[in-house]
Amino acid sequence: MDPNCSCAAAGDSCTCANSCTCKACKCTSCKKSCCSCCPPGCAKCAQGCICKGASDKCSCCA
């Protein structure tokens, strides 16, 4: 688990780096998407989006 993106429980404050790539990020302070397939600069991306295959597309950046 990424120590920079993990929290004991949802809503806990913690440090999330801009390169947050964990798949189950619960950090409310993490403004970046944790979806690795989202392209940089996608304003619609949010935590918990679902990647579609190995492409750069995901459920919130179609």
Swiss-Prot record:
A divalent metal cation 1 binds at residues 5, 7, 22, 25. A divalent metal cation 6 binds at residues 38, 42, 45, 61. InterPro entries: Metalthion_dom_sf, Metalthion_dom_sf_vert, Metalthion_vert, Metalthion_vert_metal_BS. A divalent metal cation 3 binds at residues 16, 20, 25, 30. The modification N-acetylmethionine is found at residue 1. GO terms for cellular component: cytoplasm; nucleus. Keywords: Acetylation, Cadmium, Copper, Metal-binding, Metal-thiolate cluster, Phosphoprotein, Zinc. A divalent metal cation 7 binds at residues 51, 58, 60-61. Signal peptide: none annotated. A divalent metal cation 2 binds at residues 7, 14, 16, 27. The keyword Acetylation applies. Residues 1-30 are annotated as: Beta. Residues 31-62 are annotated as: Alpha. A divalent metal cation 4 binds at residues 34-35, 45, 49. A divalent metal cation 5 binds at residues 35, 37-38, 51. The modification Phosphoserine is found at residue 59. GO terms for biological process: cellular response to cadmium ion; cellular response to copper ion; cellular response to zinc ion; detoxification of copper ion; intracellular zinc ion homeostasis; negative regulation of growth. One of its GO terms (molecular function) is zinc ion binding. Belongs to the metallothionein superfamily. Type 1 family. Class I metallothioneins contain 2 metal-binding domains: four divalent ions are chelated within cluster A of the alpha domain and are coordinated via cysteinyl thiolate bridges to 11 cysteine ligands. Cluster B, the corresponding region within the beta domain, can ligate three divalent ions to 9 cysteines. Monomer. Metallothioneins have a high content of cysteine residues that bind various heavy metals; these proteins are transcriptionally regulated by both heavy metals and glucocorticoids. This is Metallothionein-2A. It comes from Oryctolagus cuniculus.
